[in-house]
Regions:
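A glycine- and small/hydrophobic-rich beta-loop-beta segment
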Residues: 1-62
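Internal helix-turn-beta structural module
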Residues: 36, 44-48, 52-155
């Protein structure tokens, strides 16, 4: 049973990622990993809030390491935590760029950030630094094509 359960989880996670990357007009697959949450519910709420944020989706499409948009999404998550302890990194196959420490932006190379965010698979890593609970959520960017597809759609 344990082996089947683990295999099923892997298959379901892969299917979730495939669905997320197949969004209308999508150009990037986004994976948000939250760690250090005080509890599982908080980790899930924060990860989903980030991945659902239109501003975060637009920033990733624009290859803009706008950590403020990510913190904004974290801030409007209905969860109890201290925003002044939050760290944010952006990652892809081209590397990692640290953009926020202790709830504030830190100096980083815009060139490196653009290089990291030019990839099709982007990882948004958030550490709340307030516990041990983790969560992941998947989504896609918000592109011009998404607006065109949905703006032209008639029911």
């Amino acid at each position: 049973y344990a082996i089947f359960k683990k295999a099923l989880y892997i298959v379901m996670e892969c299917m979730t990622m495939m669905l997320a990357s197949d969004g209308e007009g999508a150009s990037k697959m986004l994976e948000c990993t939250v760690s250090g949450a005080p509890d599982q519910d908080t980790a899930i709420i924060v990860a989903k809030s980030i991945i659902r944020s239109p501003l975060t989706k637009c920033a990733m499409f624009g290859e803009d390491a706008n950590w403020g948009r990510i913190l904004c999404a974290i801030g409007y998550a209905e969860a109890d935590f201290d925003i002044d302890k939050v760290d944010v990194d952006l990652e892809s196959e081209k590397g990692i760029v640290e953009v926020c420490r202790n709830g504030s932006g830190i100096p980083f190379s815009e060139e490196k950030a653009s290089e990291v965010l030019s990839e099709d698979d982007i990882y948004i890593n958030v550490n709340l630094n307030q516990g041990e609970a983790p969560a992941k959520a998947w989504g896609c960017d918000l592109t011009y094509d998404y607006v065109k597809i949905n703006g032209d759609y008639r029911s």
